[in-house]
Amino acid sequence: MAGDYAVPMLSPTKLLIIGGAEDRVGKAKILKRFVKLAGGKASTIVIIPTASSFQAEVIASYSEVFTRHGCKTLDVINPADRIAADDPALANRINAATGVFMSGGNQLKLAQVFAGTAAGEAIRRAHQRGAVIGGTSAGASIMSEFMISLGDEGVTPRQRSTQLSQGLALLEGVIVDQHFAQRQRYGRLMSIVASSPNLIGIGIDEDTAIEVTDNESFTVIGRGAAYVLDCRRAITDAPEARSGAPLLVSGAVVHSLPAGSTFDLTKLVLTEFVEQHPDSGITVTVAASSRP
């Protein structure tokens, strides 16, 4: 019941968007960061395994790693369908969370169950009040307003190579793709942003995450890189190209951002790069030159 769950108020807003296949058994740097953002020993974390075909294993795995890194209070929310996701009791449990984590799996299933339901709206409210929302693979894609639910792989952008579904719109004006380099998803993300230049594409490698603060900037953590695709001023034949044809895209701006990069989502520029050299242990900070 609503009265059974105190609603914690936190600040600033945080998203932890993971490109999939993150380390869970070693140092688990990304998931450790998620627990810290959720409040560490004071955290209340809700796990949502709905996208996965191996839900028992997913629940056990994330429960173990979150507990290992300090979380004392865990809950699991796993509605079978949209009717179940509209249950106010589920929304109340999300209201009590300081962190919500969505697993990987079938992103179309995740969208069909949560987008536009009471549970989905509760996740949006949790983000707005400052609870950290984390997601990996499918759980990463659903954070944007529109998400890639199906799509071809490969480095060449092709016309109509993807299918979009409604996401949770936690990060508006952006479309997220995951397993980016490992599954060669550059082409499909570029085709979307070339066809919809109002959207900025963000691709994230495996065992890599972006930590988004107040929907204004993000910092990259993990073993790989994140990529920002900006086609606002690109030339493209997307309106005329036949289905499946390679797209003309000229003048797109692509940022390749390894761990330690901080990127401004409002100005679409790199603001800082912090690199720790493994041999010397010296940390080098490079402040990017500002541009109008």
Task: Tell me what each language-model feature is.
Residues 92-93, 116-130:
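Catalytic-core regions built around general acid/base machinery
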Residues 17, 75-77, 101-102, 133-136, ...:
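General beta-strand structural signal in soluble alpha/beta enzymes
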Residues 2-41, 53-61, 66-68, 147-149, ...:
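C-terminal and late-domain segments of enzyme folds
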Residues 102-104, 123-147:
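Catalytic nucleophile loop
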Residues 107-117:
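Glycine/threonine-rich flexible loop motifs
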Residues 46, 52-97, 102, 109:
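Portal/gating segments that form or line small-molecule/metal binding sites
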